[in-house]
Amino acid sequence: MTDKEVKAPKIEFPVVDYPIKVISDTGVGRKDLILEIVRKHATINDQRVDERSSSTGKYTTIQLHIVATDQDQLYNINSELRATGFVHMVL
């Protein structure tokens, strides 16, 4: 790698307050399913779960904070959420 190449930032695990934002279609029970999926992989700070609807009501954003232990954990959360079919993005 040359000096001009940019290195990807590395996360030092564990991260006690790691934010995750999930953008999905709006629907009954979807927030509960999203939280259930994330809870299979991580501890959620229930005090820091926020839900917002888009201006049209078509999409919902759920922001939550977890204890992140490693990159595999984050990958598994992302993969399982995306496999639902109603989650569009996990940031």
Curated annotation (Swiss-Prot):
The family note in this entry says: Belongs to the UPF0250 family.
Q: Give the Gene3D superfamilies listed for this entry.
A: 3.30.70.260
Q: Which residues form a coiled coil?
A: none
> In this record, what's one Pfam family?
DUF493
What PANTHER family does this protein map onto? UPF0250 PROTEIN YBED
Cysteine pairings via disulfide bonds = none
The record, for NCBIfam families, names: PRK00341.1 (NF001486)
The leader peptide range reads none
Top-rank lineage group of the source organism? Bacteria
Cellular-component GO terms for this entry: cytosol
Its name, as the record gives it, is: UPF0250 protein PFLU_5418
